[in-house]
Amino acid sequence: MMMSNACLYLETIIRPHMKTFFRAMLTAFALLPSMASHAQIANDHTVLSTPWNAYWIAPPNDPGRECGVYYFRKALDLSAKPSTFNVKVSADNRYKLYVNGTLVSVGPARGDTYYWNYETVDLAPYLNTGKNSIAAIVWNEAESRPEAQISLRTAFIVQGNTANEEILNTDNSWKCLQDKGYAAITGIGYPTYYVAGPGELVDMNKSIKNWMTTDFDDHAWPDAEELDHGKPKGMSDAFGWMLVPSAIPQMERTLQRIPVLRKADGITLPAGFPATQTAVLIPANTTVTLLLDQTYLTSAYVRLNFSGGKGAAMSLMYAEALFDNLKQFGSRKGNRNDVEGKDFAGRRDSIISDGTPGQSFNTLYWRTFRYIRLRVQTKDDPLTIDDLYGTFTGYPFKLNAKFQSDNPEIQKILDIGWRTARLDAMETYMDCPYYEQLQYIGDTRIQAMVSYYNSGDDRLARNAINLMDHSRIAEGLTLSRHPSYSPQIIPTFSLWYVGVLHDYWMYRPDSNFVKDKLPGIRDILSFFSRYQQADGSLKNVPYWNFIDWAGNGSHDYSHPPTGKNGGSSIMDMQLMMAYQWAAEMEKRMGMPAMAILYKEKADQLEKTIHINYWDAAKGLYADNEDKDLFSQHANSLAILSGLVKGQEATSVAKKMLADSTLTQCTIYFKYYLHQALVKAGLGDGYLDWLDIWRKNIAMGLTTWAEISDLPHARSDCHAWGASPNVEFYRTVLGIDSYAPGFSKIRIEPHLGALTNVSGEMPHPNGKVAVSYKKRGGAWKISITLPEITSGILVWKGKTYPLKAGENLF
């Protein structure tokens, strides 16, 4: 039965002339020994190690790869309300699961077919004695789907945890019907790299209403089609979706009203709209355009309730900011608060009214916006807007860090940074929520550090590390971003992945998790070793070796500048740092021989880099062996890697600040620049280095832009710019890890002109709290460490021991 079902499934997704081949392959696979499931949950072993009794189900007679929205329903009669009712749920592309009309789960968390996530949900709180309805909306955006959405075909699955709950297992007793009222709207109205999915066109005349309610009559719906049993990852014949439990919680969903109306053309609106639920009557044969302002960037599911208006067309368009003049200046943006004389373009949804009362449009997926433009064109029937609001969504991070000072600017920077970090964290970290929604390693390194310092929740970071590890290709490199259905390779991001893992090792108490990833690190470094010359330097490394969105007029640093011999100091320094990190981890929990090898390679690079790139006349490292290009990037890495130390490092750091001819780091790479300046002894100047963040604020941004050229920044929300949310705690308050797992704490504040500052941050054992107050010429210092944790205070050149609990100086 298992084999025939597998073949039936394959018949739905492969060309007919391939069936014989795959049947033969399945027979061969059946002879292989069964592998252990990748994870286990208490009292849940069976559904993790054997085929599920539930089937993947699909719309009947549907090819499975076309754009469409589908409803699945199952009636459930219960003699008593259960205390628990746990089920596992997944779908391709995505689902929303309802019990008796209440939304209970959204997913699946993004992954790939080798690690396809399912959510475990307790339905008991939503079930009643007697009749119940279990309903799901499943959608497939096909070729229009987001770049981050990997897919096989339209499908849905529910598996009960125990025999009592298996009554809900998906099979052909479930009903399924396509909603013919949906179509995709592609494009955002201007040329740019946009891969975050389509908008929706919903014709309410064709759409199915109230499909999730208990009393909905689905008797005429066809039965769902059974594909194949669900297969946990690791089974001998697992193919298609290899099911694994989601490692992250459900996303937050919180009501969020839109507070401000900026413009209204064609109508006079009643007071209160849209900040409160206020009905707006739009007369027949009228065109109305409303510009709504959330006042800050957000990500939310958008809901529009309306009545009447037979044949009326409504359009919701979403934008981070308005444009100066798209035809004349392209996507140039000015102050993000300005709307007069501006152009509006962006992702959009469109709705056609069927004229009945109580209609509702809910976006399938969340939208990112500060501004919404609502345009309504009525025909012969007036239309009433009953309500318009959002439901904020994001990874459920909690802010567990505090910073108090007499400088209100610091709190504003922290608030904007935290908003940026939250909007760039959903089921994965993302580079940006509006345009890409992709988890890039270079971005993720900084985002994970923000999570450690501000929240202490490391689940999304662990998930990111796992996804990066899963993405490795045969050559050894990670993909630059994952999940992503279009492979992109940035070797320099694979080197930053070594840093991501080293960061996790230093700040989180789970060395076994890190140890499990060391084979992947070896593969990455093995790849780079193939391009190392006799002296250790790199040459002709393939793919896209991205450094930063920086430039100096003669060179674009999205690729490293190389000299006549093909050398790049930046790449050599990154490789050297990766060897250093890997050597530390191998020495403590891996293979000692590899630790020795990596240290030797790092030492060789140290000598080679100094010979090839050091310019004695300038007292700086050049970007290439021709010594005709110099940057903050190369010299930041020189300090961080230990190429220069002590007074020499201080000299290099001062020149980086003073010499404007050096290629300047953008907001992204300032994460490394600022660490280098601190390491070189200039940390008391940290507050003087924040001009780009101040410019963002002055330009009306409520999140940090992608690049430092604010008028031409594509994305207004890139969390790689949220590094102050690390450095106000690590640099200013001085709290840092002093041993793997944050098992020891180093406190070395850099207060600059601040004389009254305090704060706290989460720690694996509790929290770290510090207070620095200057009275006259004397300082009062209080440092509280969590239980079973010790550390040191470095203050004015002296070192003092710290114990768990309160330490006063």
Residue ranges of each PLM-predicted region?
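Extracellular/oxidizing-compartment recognition motifs
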Residues: 40-431, 443, 459-460, 464, ...
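Active-site acid/base region of carbohydrate-active enzymes
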Residues: 169-179, 185, 371, 379-416, ...
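Alpha-helical repeat scaffolds
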Residues: 649-656, 687-689
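Alpha-helical support elements that line or immediately flank enzyme active sites
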Residues: 301-320, 372-377, 442-471, 501-508, ...
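Well-ordered alpha-helical segments within folded domains of soluble proteins
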Residues: 441-452, 461-462, 491-503, 568-584, ...
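Non-catalytic C-terminal accessory modules of carbohydrate-active enzymes
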Residues: 187, 192-210, 271-273, 600, ...
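Bacterial Sec-dependent N-terminal signal peptides
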Residues: 1-43
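Solvent-exposed loop and edge beta-strand segments that line ligand/cofactor-binding
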Residues: 291-294, 362, 428-441, 482-494, ...
